[in-house]
Amino acid sequence: MLRIPLFVVVSALPLFGFSSEPMVSVRSELRDGSIYVETEATIAATFETIWEALTDYDRLSNFIPGMKSSRLLRYEGSTAFVEQKGSAKFLFFELPIEVVVRSIEDRPHSIRIELDEGTLERLSGGYQLRNAGRENLWNLSWSGYIEPSIPIPNFLTERLIRNDLRAQFEGMVIEIQRRTEAIFTRDRESVK
């Protein structure tokens, strides 16, 4: 099997329509009182780089917009219990969020997220990771349900959650790209 070095893949991305700005697709709809959101992006990175960013629980607030803190409380088997605090904003409205989530890691395919406790009525979903047909090219997606515990008009809720999830997902993709570029730079300098 032909193995193409990661720096070659990263260097060629502009030729294939990929840029340093994340190309994120987002779809949302109201379902059974909750907002269902799907986000997806194609990322040129190693599996390890992607997985390390997704599971860097203590540093998520450094690169996820709207997240003020994220702290790994403990692991129980392959389940990480993570405390997160932040807010979702849309126009003049701000929804404070404080949750403890269970991140159920099914390496290498997915991380399922379930609400353990907090200020949301419902949070269930997760990340899916699939190879995009080439070495070091991946489809990363997040899909799930979110329902605030306070009553908010549906037209505001859907926009609030969709915009917030887009920003958070883009933050994750940008961090993966940043880590990939750091590896590429380090590898390139070690060859000199």
Residue ranges and their predicted role:
Residues 1-6:
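Bacterial N-terminal signal peptides that target proteins for export
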Residues 10-17:
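Hydrophobic h-region of N-terminal signal peptides that target proteins for export
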Residues 17-77, 192:
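Hydrophobic ligand-binding cavity/cleft-lining segments
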Residues 22, 35-41, 84-86, 97-99, ...:
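One face of beta-strands
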Residues 22, 65, 93-97, 119-126, ...:
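Amphipathic hydrophobic-ligand
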Residues 30, 42, 71-118, 170-179, ...:
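Glycine-rich portal/gate segments that line the openings of hydrophobic small-molecule binding cavities
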Residues 50-51, 60, 103, 140-142:
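Hydrophobic pocket/interface hotspot
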Residues 115-163:
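Beta-strand/loop substructures that line and gate deep hydrophobic ligand-binding cavities in soluble
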